[in-house]
Amino acid sequence: MGWLGRLMLFPVLRWVVLGISFSSAVAADPIRKPVRSLLEIREDRVIVQKWETSCAAAALATVLTFSHNDPVTEKAVTMGMLRTTDPIKVKVRGGFSMLDMKHFVETRGLNGIGYKNLSFDDLLTLDAPIVPIDFQGNPHFVVVRGLKGDGEVHLADPAFGNHAISAEKFKSVWKDGMAFVVTE
């Protein structure tokens, strides 16, 4: 029996030899695939809000940047909306309104359309609607990405990033069938 045959009698050494041969073959032909963290996935194509009451600005920045190819920051939207509204009203309301968003997009040469009493099915026909929801008793704006095959509404949420909730849960927190849509 040669040295290789004797080596194969020892299980640990056999795996070391086989492991070296296998790893050499793998190293010769590496597989390259981009890896993203959970944070990157959660924040993909979402402008995350930096301030407690800036969800409207971040949601609008998300829609302008990713749906209308008009890159803008949350801060720029906030400052722009403050120029077209009464800051005291914003403070009393606890944030911006859909009318504030409308005035801002008009300064950028776009149109803003507000809806009320929409049905859920009608909402799903709109392109990147920003909707007000009730989040634990507080008003909050999110972007609806659509209803997926799993029966969940996928959201671009300025506070929590991309996530999904059941259609029933969404309907229970969606305020008055309201939506805001930016058009060309």
Please state what every model-predicted region is.
Residues 10-24:
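Bacterial N-terminal signal peptides
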Residues 50-65, 93-105:
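Active-site nucleophilic cysteine motif
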Residues 57-88:
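Early exported N-terminus immediately downstream of N-terminal targeting peptides
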